[in-house]
Amino acid sequence: MRRLFALILVICLSFSFAPPAKALGADLTPCAENPAFQALAKNARNTTADPQSGQKRFERYSQALCGPEGYPHLIVDGRLDRAGDFLIPSILFLYIAGWIGWVGRAYLQAIKKDSDTEQKEIQLDLGLALPIIATGFAWPAAAVKELLSGELTAKDSEITVSPR
């Protein structure tokens, strides 16, 4: 049985091979020079009330890199010349997600002291939540402060370990 399994494994591994990998962006060209992109730009539809919105959109896209199909591709390799494409929006996303998480955590800690905690989790107490939301923009500094003071992490004695 072991030999049969080994034989099947050898056959499967010998027939399963990965195609050669291409370098990131090797087949990408500037959209302004891409014929497929130019064909798409000629048929650009307006997406707003502005009659030139389609043309303006494709003018902005012409600064990007396009594949052979004519569509712009997002390069996410860490080069700073493309930071505006991905790096800045991703940092902004992480900041906003952290703000939401920090404010939610602070709200749950604030209502924990009340008697109707479950009700305040379902129906937000806006009188309590709005000041917390307003101060949430400084969450990175508050997180560092709580991390250094030990408030952010639980003590080892508070963490239960189940016996096995």
Curated annotation (Swiss-Prot):
BP terms from Gene Ontology: photosynthesis
Disulfide bonds: none
Keyword Chloroplast: no
Subcellular location: Cellular thylakoid membrane
Superkingdom classification of source: Bacteria
GO cellular component term of the entry, any: photosystem I reaction center
Signal peptide boundaries: 1-23
Pfam families listed in its UniProt record: PSI_PsaF
Keywords: Membrane, Photosynthesis, Photosystem I, Signal, Thylakoid, Transmembrane, Transmembrane helix
Membrane topology: Multi-pass membrane protein
Membrane-spanning residues: 83-103, 124-144
Family to which the UniProt record says this protein belongs: Belongs to the PsaF family.
Function: Probably participates in efficiency of electron transfer from plastocyanin to P700 (or cytochrome c553 in algae and cyanobacteria). This plastocyanin-docking protein contributes to the specific association of plastocyanin to PSI.
Annotated protein name in UniProt: Photosystem I reaction center subunit III
Organism of origin: Trichormus variabilis (strain ATCC 29413 / PCC 7937) (Anabaena variabilis)
